[in-house]
Regions:
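Active-site-facing substrate-recognition patch
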Residues: 1-36, 113-118
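Residues at the starts of beta-strands that form the adenosine-phosphate
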Residues: 95, 137, 165-168, 263
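Phosphate-binding active sites in nucleotide-utilizing proteins
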Residues: 20, 26-35, 40-59, 69-70, ...
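Conserved small/polar residues in nucleotide/adenosyl-binding loops
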Residues: 311-316
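Flexible loop/turn segments at secondary-structure boundaries
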Residues: 50-55, 103-108, 146-149, 174-180, ...
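Short, glycine/charge-rich flexible loops or terminal/linker lids adjacent to PRPP-binding catalytic cores
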Residues: 60-137, 177-190
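Acidic, metal-coordinating catalytic segment for phosphate/diphosphate chemistry
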Residues: 177-305
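Extended, hydrophobic alpha-helical segments in both membrane/secreted and soluble proteins
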Residues: 51-58, 137-158
């Protein structure tokens, strides 16, 4: 199970340490795109504490990229380079800071419901003076973005206080789109920010018929043996790219009054598989459950979601 390795397993295990580092490294091309390759005006950081190892992997990948740039710049100087020009090139560094500080006495996932929201605002603080306001981008890596509660209630707001030109939030795992039924407490569809974003996109683009069709097909197979059931929740995501869903998440999670431009970058599924080649269990990201029971449960979770959110569909 890959999510367990990203989030729950002990980071002291050598294989898990290497996998988490690779997850950070795999994100470098997407991060560079998000900041228009402007390394000189970007500060890199992480959400403490579980994302720290992926952060080191990301820094390693960025160092490799910067070294390639330096080689090309030095080569362009010719056979008799000017010392000052060389010094300018060699002085370029990846700028990393500990921007967010976590109060270790508090943990958002301990609290349930409304108390979780109250907690979220008090878990993090920031280091002032860690970037140049209005000039620098801020790239901050987290291990996963599941509900988005802490981002909305706390993190984006406090990072914005530093005055970055752009905030890029990077998830070392892919978009969590489906519930887990094998020991991790993630059972309701409405909890997932990826699912909420896809539903919003369907509404916006006048594609509510996709929701109705997925519901009808899910309802029609309730009496079937679980081995014959299909995960029709995939139809909710099918019309959109990962980037479209991420962009809608930004709209849903960015608090009013945020001055910086915000972007969310997720690990692609292929990046996850390359980083964790021996642990391909990815059902919360892909919807490919390892047992028929998982398909039956996600089917029911979607029906339950419609029952609460779309009373007019329930009658069909």
């Amino acid at each position: 199970c890959s999510f367990e390795r990203i989030y729950f397993s002990r980071g002291s295990d050598v294989d898990i340490y290497k996998e988490r580092k690779r997850l950070g490294e795999k994100l470098v091309p997407k991060i560079l795109k998000a900041i228009n390759n402007d390394i000189d005006h970007t500060v890199f950081s992480f959400i403490p504490n579980t994302a720290e190892v992926a952060f080191y992997g990301m820094l390693q990948g960025l160092d490799d990229y910067l070294n390639e740039e330096k080689v090309q710049q030095i080569a362009a100087l010719g056979h008799n380079p000017n010392m000052e020009e060389l010094e300018v090139i060699l002085s370029r560094r990846i700028r990393s800071e500990k921007v967010a500080i976590k109060d270790i006495k508090l943990r958002t996932f301990i609290a349930e419901g409304n108390s979780r929201n109250d907690l979220a605002a008090h878990v993090y603080d920031i280091t002032y003076g860690s970037l140049v306001p209005g000039v620098d981008n801020l790239v901050i890596i987290d291990d996963s973005i599941v509900r988005g509660t802490t981002l909305k209630q706390s993190i984006i707001g406090i990072l914005d206080r530093l005055g970055p030109k752009k905030i890029v939030i990077v998830s070392s795992s892919p978009q969590v789109r489906y519930p887990d039924y094998y020991g991790i407490d993630m059972a309701k569809m409405s909890e997932f920010i990826a699912f909420r974003a896809a539903i919003e996109l369907l509404k916006e683009r006048d594609m509510k018929d996709v929701i109705a069709a997925a519901y009808r097909k899910s309802k029609d197979q309730v009496g079937l043996p679980k081995e014959q059931m299909v995960n029709y929740v995939k139809d909710i995501y099918a019309p959109f790219t990962d980037e479209e869903i991420s962009a809608k998440m930004v709209e849903l999670l960015t608090p009013k009054g945020t001055k910086a431009k915000v972007e969310i970058v997720y690990q692609p599924l292929e990046g996850l598989h390359e980083a964790c080649p021996n642990h391909l269990g990815d059902w919360y990201f892909s919807g490919n459950y390892p047992t028929p029971g998982g398909v039956k449960m996600v089917n029911q979770a979607f029906i339950n979601y419609i029952a609460v959110s779309y009373t007019h569909l329930r009658a069909h």
